[in-house]
């Protein structure tokens, strides 16, 4: 009854004033806690401390605009490689040394941003914009040894990368960027020519083929230490396949046109098949009774005529070839029973086979020279690396006139979902076991590209 309305009113005003004063402090703390310094590092009111020149690559560079706040940062093209350019750009340096955000835009591509604390972080980087409508996001580029022929995840973040024109294979962690070079003994590594790998986790082994030494090498999957070498009588060893039913490893031999059979325990070649055409990719049937062989051609004397070979494991001979002639390169299982996918390099297509009917169900057109294919662990997508046309006069070991492409095929409908441009001759390709990442190797750029899959 003795309350004073005037005092209450003044007290209420004071409380509201205190709240209003606390709002900026609250926002400041939220920004600091979340790591989002965009409200704190706007270039508008920041004091500059000169500029720093950086050099990095942009894909694509034509039509691309780079902004810092409202300011457009011009760049100078130093080198061009089709749609990719090495550029030079002056970036403002601020006294507060807080993070800055570069925003990139280009017609036909999704807007992108790149955050750095120091300008030198951009040096030697690749910024690749994602095409409009694409659901895969470019994350990073890592340099490798010369000519990364294939890639294989050995866990969720580490890759085994055999090098065709180098002395072994790189094992690279896509989170840290740390690389370890694995090489066999001196007499082997100097011959170069490392091609493909298999990982056998149940026996803690990582195998790699070396075609120019006619050999296969075994490393410890955990420690990466060298363990053994298997010398082969087959010539130019390529694809490796582990048979868990018989505890054997198969290796396709390009020049001798046969397949070496290796005892995994003894690390010895125990036999070879007869000539079976020019073998490339290999796949074992689920019951282990048949071995499917991607014939690049019918023989070394022919430029075409390769089909899908069916080899009987009991009879130890080729019992059938199916499908149209071409240059079959790689085979993977489909997401349903009796379904497999085969890449055909000469015909720019992926063939879908019904193994029960022993025929091609469908052909899916893709870009030139499709080679490695990989089914995502979740079974949703088949990924295809397409090298693109060879150089018109100097073959595939010289950069061609256009860049290669990566295709994504929806396995429910077996239709192309999306595709985008990669580097010079994308060749190796794999998806991480946890479904998060797609990695490809740009064979003639000596690098890999890492993409984040949608939803992961």
UniProtKB/Swiss-Prot annotation:
May be useful for detecting a broad spectrum of Leptospira infection in humans and animals due to its presence in several pathogenic serovars of L.interrogans including copenhageni, canicola, hardjo, icterohaemorrhagiae and pomona, and also in L.borgpetersenii hardjo. May be used for serodiagnosis of both early and convalescent phases of leptospirosis infectious disease. InterPro entries: Host-pathogen_enzymatic-act, Lactonase_7-beta_prop, N2O_reductase_N, WD40/YVTN_repeat-like_dom_sf. Disulfide bonds join 346-347. One of its GO terms (biological process) is positive regulation of plasminogen activation. Pfam families: Lactonase. Residues 1-34 form the signal peptide. GO terms for cellular component: cell outer membrane. Keywords: Cell outer membrane, Disulfide bond, Lipoprotein, Membrane, Signal. Coiled coil: none annotated. SUPFAM superfamilies: Nitrous oxide reductase, N-terminal domain. It is found in: Cell outer membrane. It comes from the Bacteria. May be involved in virulence. Binds human plasminogen (PLG) and stimulates its proteolytic cleavage to enzymatically active plasmin in the presence of an urokinase-type PLG activator in vitro. Activated plasmin has proteolytic activity which may help the bacteria to spread throughout the host by degrading extracellular matrix components, facilitating tissue penetration and invasion. This is Antigen Lp49. The gene is orfC.
